[in-house]
Amino acid sequence: MENKDIKILIQEVLEKGYLMSLGIVDEDGVWVADVYCVHDDDLNIYWMSDPDTRHSQAILKNNKVAGTITVSNKGEDNLGIQFEGVAQKIEGVRWDLAKKHFTKRNKPEPQESDDVLDGDSWYVLQPTKIDLICERYFGFDKQIFEL
């Protein structure tokens, strides 16, 4: 399978998935937080979080992160991604992301007068490497996609 086909399968996981397990490292060790996420065409992953949470604070000090998104259910072939990259806080309301975020969670589309952040901030993870697990096509042989 060609690299473009691997990217299409990765995009399928990002489109179907909504919950990312985000791994960070801080002065207290390793930590994982589940966050609702959306993505863009360049495979960047976005989420909203309270800036005071452990994972948000850790990203300010060490932006190297890892994560997983799995979209398979019991009885289905495994389909998911594991990835590493760099994360950072981004400024602004980002209505484009807010609309995608609310739609993905089956919530009404926000109005521009709504306080969609409610004290939270947007963050972006730019992957440098993505491992695809697609049991239907590859068994448990991970397909590596370098960015």
Name every feature range the model reports, one short phrase each.
Residues M1-L19:
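Extreme N-terminal tail/first-helix region
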Residues E2, L79-L147:
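Charged, gly/pro-rich active-site loop segments
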Residues I6, R54, I59-N63:
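Short amphipathic alpha-helical segments
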Residues L14, A58-I59, H101-F102:
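A generic structural signal for nonpolar/aromatic side chains embedded in well-ordered alpha-helices
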Residues E15-S21, R105-P108:
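Short Pro/Gly-enriched beta-strand edge/turn motifs at strand-loop
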Residues G17-P51, I59, A66-T70, Q82:
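Short beta-strand segments
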Residues D50-R54, K104:
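Short, solvent-exposed aromatic-acidic interface loops
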Residues T53-H55, K74, F138-F140:
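Short, surface-exposed beta-strand-loop junctions and turns on beta-sheet-rich folds
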